[in-house]
């Protein structure tokens, strides 16, 4: 496994290491043809292609083999942190000798700055930053600027503003053994890079001094570096074990990158401060002309305070709102983002593109609408608008080769792709489930008979309904009929959801009822029947895409079957049925031609990588505290657990704990409990980006 901290030497001799996949198996099924078609398409000049891969066909492995063939730095974007974490682990195992990095929002908790005009209430930005994820973000940008064999797995955070990569690279400090530099001179340079001196709490982004020895903990690294001086010359450098303090290796040279992505050289900071001050005075005059003296005073006081902090420390809270001044951009120009740290020629993989593309498209307008009231009421200068995510057009302009990956590509992907390459035949040779339509009248009685058949074969059943009330009533009915059944609803937290899946797999119950069973973690080999009630009703959960996705839940069992209960066959139903039957024909023909026999996927229950399954979650949703003091202690305990969960990449669990903390703060009127969930109605969920 590659060292996530990366080597320390600035020359990076391993920068020429080629991408090489290490997998326990060779491409199979449709994978060899898909890999060859995609690679040929790019080599022939295609800029955008789509990999249409059915559930369980090994799309991630196919993407990996394509990367190996193209030998290009690669950005992989997922639509939430949890999926990004899963992909990160998969790519790390497939590319053990290359730099596989992880770039998502570093917030455990995030309440965006906002102003609610109706109640004249200003809400300060409130955030809890996860230091480990911050380290991983810096590791990603460092790798992109110092080596070629890089894969970055990211959430939509990849399109949000980041510092100028040229400043980040040019301000980097190269230190070599034998170099003539005084100890105090090195300390001053580290401060310029926004490193903090801390002789007690020695963590990433800090340094400490012990006589003629300086120890620096790089922002991106897992190991601190000891620099020993002999007079005004560096005598020795070593990488240290962070716990024992013992020497891991001697280092001839070290390259320190800034501790903040928004780091700016002193001369440029002075120029930026003057430009900000000029714009502030213009904004004050604007408010005075319109008679809004409160806003005029507010923008002057707030901006002046920020300028004083920037002049003194080179940084201020909310410095991202001044990002346009800290680079060579003009107002309205696209912000610098993670994409600008990539070389000109790189591959972008958009995973689950039918969900990720709409998410990318929606970020810009959502961010702008929240800032309107802040700018209009003097809380921020208009240039705060330039601290924003990319528009979709800007995103498309900054990317080069693009590969959309989905079992159900959307209209955008199909329209933009030069080729839609299908991966229909699975390496396991399983075929898509058989589909039947049953009358909605008497659907529950029919379902009971089908459940009995599955129980007799020690198989499992998923049932999806349209409403919470119907799911509850059906669960109650099945229980009274003696069926071992559980119900998964929108309030089921992360750990409970995974425990439900685990219990279903172990046979603790036979049927799982839910409303939206498209979520990750529900690819269960033991499920041989998916029952879709009220399949002919219009709506998102009964669209062609959703139906195909739901049908795929039965695609990992050789006896897989889907039953649609409906009074009529809608266009969405027919399209989903036609597509599934088309895939079945292709899969069965392949099996007949090659003499292969499909078998149910065998996967030990313990092999399921369930975020949060091994985390102590006692009291997360336990008994309510009796008074404010108990509540405050519980919130403090929960906050520590939230940070631990996020550090372990268990983001859904961290989100559940965050929500419990909000409930306690509101119920007992603790600090931070009076902020609305999202005043502008547009802030992205922390676990999404």
From Swiss-Prot:
Segments forming domain Helicase C-terminal: 443-605
GO terms for cellular component: cytoplasm; excinuclease repair complex
Assigned keywords, A-Z: ATP-binding, Cytoplasm, DNA damage, DNA excision, DNA repair, Excision nuclease, Nucleotide-binding, SOS response
Stretches for region Disordered: 1-26, 668-689
Listed SMART domains: DEXDc, HELICc
All residue ranges annotated as the UVR domain in the record: 632-667
Primary location: cytoplasm
Motif position, Beta-hairpin: 106-129
Similarity comment: family membership: Belongs to the UvrB family.
Official protein name in the record: UvrABC system protein B
Record organism: Halobacterium salinarum (strain ATCC 700922 / JCM 11081 / NRC-1) (Halobacterium halobium)
């Amino acid at each position: 496994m590659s060292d996530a901290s990366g080597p320390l030497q600035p020359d990076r001799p391993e920068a020429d290491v080629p991408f090489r996949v290490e997998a326990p198996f060779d491409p199979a099924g449709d994978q060899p043809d898909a890999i060859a078609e995609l690679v040929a398409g790019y080599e022939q000049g295609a800029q955008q292609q789509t990999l249409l891969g059915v559930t369980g066909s090994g799309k991630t492995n196919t993407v990996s083999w394509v990367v190996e063939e193209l030998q290009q730095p690669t950005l992989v974007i997922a639509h939430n942190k949890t999926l990004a974490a899963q992909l990160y682990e998969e790519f790390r195992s497939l590319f053990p000798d290359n730099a596989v990095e992880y770039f998502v929002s570093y917030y455990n908790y995030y309440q965006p700055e906002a102003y609610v005009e109706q109640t004249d209430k200003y809400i300060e930005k409130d955030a809890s930053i996860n230091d480990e994820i911050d380290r991983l973000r810096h590791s990603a940008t460092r790798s992109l600027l110092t080596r070629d064999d890089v894969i970055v797995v990211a959430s939509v955070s990849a399109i949000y503003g980041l510092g100028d990569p040229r400043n980040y690279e040019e301000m980097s400090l190269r230190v070599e053994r034998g170099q003539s530099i005084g100890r105090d001179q090195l300390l001053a340079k580290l401060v310029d890079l926004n490193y903090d001196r801390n002789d007690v709490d020695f963590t990433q982004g800090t340094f400490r001094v012990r006589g003629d020895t300086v120890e620096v903990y790089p922002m991106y690294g897992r190991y601190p570096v000891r620099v020993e001086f002999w007079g005004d010359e560096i005598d020795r450098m070593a990488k240290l074990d962070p716990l024992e303090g013992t020497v891991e290796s001697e280092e001839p040279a070290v390259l320190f990158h800034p501790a903040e992505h928004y780091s700016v050289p002193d001369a440029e900071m002075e120029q930026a401060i003057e430009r900000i001050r000029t714009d502030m005075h213009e904004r004050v005059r604007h408010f005075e002309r319109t008679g809004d003296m409160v806003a005029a005073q507010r923008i002057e006081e707030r901006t002046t305070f920020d300028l004083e902090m920037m002049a003194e420390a080179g940084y201020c809270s909310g410095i991202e709102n001044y990002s346009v001044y800290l680079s060579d951009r003009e107002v309205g120009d696209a912000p610098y983002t993670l994409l600008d740290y990539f070389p000109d020629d790189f591959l972008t993989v958009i995973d689950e593109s039918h969900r990720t593309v709409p998410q990318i498209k929606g970020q810009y307008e959502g961010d702008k609408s929240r800032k309107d009231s802040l700018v209009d009421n003097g809380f921020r200068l208009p240039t705060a608008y330039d601290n924003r995510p990319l528009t979709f057009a800007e995103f498309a302009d900054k990317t080069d080769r693009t590969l959309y990956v989905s079992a159900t590509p959307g209209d955008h992907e199909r329209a933009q792709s030069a080729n839609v390459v299908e991966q229909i035949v699975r390496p396991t040779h399983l075929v898509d489930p058989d589909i039947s339509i049953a009358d909605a009248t008497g659907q529950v009685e029919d379902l009971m008979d089908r459940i009995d058949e599955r129980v007799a074969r020690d198989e499992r059943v998923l049932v999806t309904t349209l409403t919470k009330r119907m799911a509850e009533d059906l669960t109650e009915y099945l229980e009274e009929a003696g069926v071992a059944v559980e119900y998964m609803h929108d309030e089921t937290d992360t750990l409970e959801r995974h425990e439900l899946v685990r219990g279903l797999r172990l046979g603790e119950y036979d049927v799982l009822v839910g409303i939206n069973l498209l979520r990750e973690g529900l690819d269960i080999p033991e499920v041989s029947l998916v029952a879709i009630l009220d399949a002919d009703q219009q709506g998102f959960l009964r669209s062609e895409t959703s139906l195909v996705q739901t049908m795929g839940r039965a695609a990992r069992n050789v006896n897989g079957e889907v039953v649609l209960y409906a009074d009529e066959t809608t266009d969405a139903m027919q399209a989903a049925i036609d597509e599934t039957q088309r895939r079945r024909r292709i899969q069965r023909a392949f099996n007949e031609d090659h003499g292969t026999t499909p078998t149910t996927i065998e996967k030990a229950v313990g092999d399921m990588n369930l975020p949060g399954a091994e985390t102590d979650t006692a009291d997360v949703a336990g008994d309510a505290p009796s008074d404010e003091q108990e509540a405050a202690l519980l919130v403090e305990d929960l906050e520590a657990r939230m940070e631990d969960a996020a550090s372990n990449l268990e983001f859904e669990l961290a989100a559940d704990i965050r929500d419990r903390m909000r409930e306690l703060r509101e119920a007992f009127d603790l600090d931070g409990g009076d902020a609305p969930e999202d005043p502008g109605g547009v802030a992205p969920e922390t676990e999404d980006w």
